[in-house]
Amino acid sequence: MRLHRFFLPFSATDNSLIIADEKIVNQIKNVLRLKDGDEILIFNGEKERKGKIEEIAKNAIRIILKEEVINLRESKIKVKLFCSLLKKDNFELVVQKATEVGVKEIYPIISKRTVKFDFKKERMDKIIKEASEQSMRISLPILHQTISFQEALKESSQNQLNVFCDLSSPLFSETLKEKLISKKIDSLGVFIGPEGGWSEEEIHLAKDNNFLMVKLSDLVFRSETAAIVAVYLFSHLLANND
């Protein structure tokens, strides 16, 4: 049976820990109805260990930490998502699904046609933690503060490849796929525009920076759909070429 996972801080020398977080205690006691002796998984963003519930008290739970679990699910490809800020629910969906498919860093960007200019960091961090627990990944993606499109271009210069998703660009094809997987790439940037699309100036700047210009489909995707499709498609192709 698959063990339930929880994101909790612990150090390499810890043999036990006390869970005092009210929400986690409630989840273990009243939602999952776990009992003394049941095993769970604990991860801290770097390592994962098995844990055994030793005692469930009224407001806290004592866990005995056991052996480390070797997790081979994490991709070796460092994928960074540069996504224009979207309306609240749509951007939350992007953050959740990007976490689930293994994105390492998320950069909310302000582009010319962006209509949303801020987000609730605390809410997003909660979404990231829960998506990491569910998807069985160990590391949590880094959610950066909002940056401008120009700042995103500078940040993306560290990547071996940057993919710019745009409806006016060539359709992703088998030829492009073969060209892509023939390269040894371990860092990838994926750029997703706002609801109103990229401006002509932004498209030209992406071309000037030698971005791979791609239309994902002949169908017109919403921005949040494009983000999920793109990060999975390109990270999957490159990971399979590893």
Regions found by a protein language model. Name each.
Residues 1-70:
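N-terminal positively charged helical leader segments and presequences
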Residues 162-205, 209-215:
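Active-site/ligand-binding-proximal alpha/beta "capping" segment
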Residues 72-164:
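RNA substrate-binding interface of SAM-dependent RNA methyltransferases
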Residues 11, 68, 111-114, 218-219:
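Short, ordered loop/turn segments at secondary-structure junctions
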Residues 40, 64, 70, 74-81, ...:
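Mobile, glycine- and charge-enriched loop segments
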Residues 40, 140-144, 213:
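Generic structural signal for residues in well-ordered beta-strands
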Residues 200-242:
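Structured adenosyl-cofactor binding patch, chiefly the S-adenosyl-L-methionine
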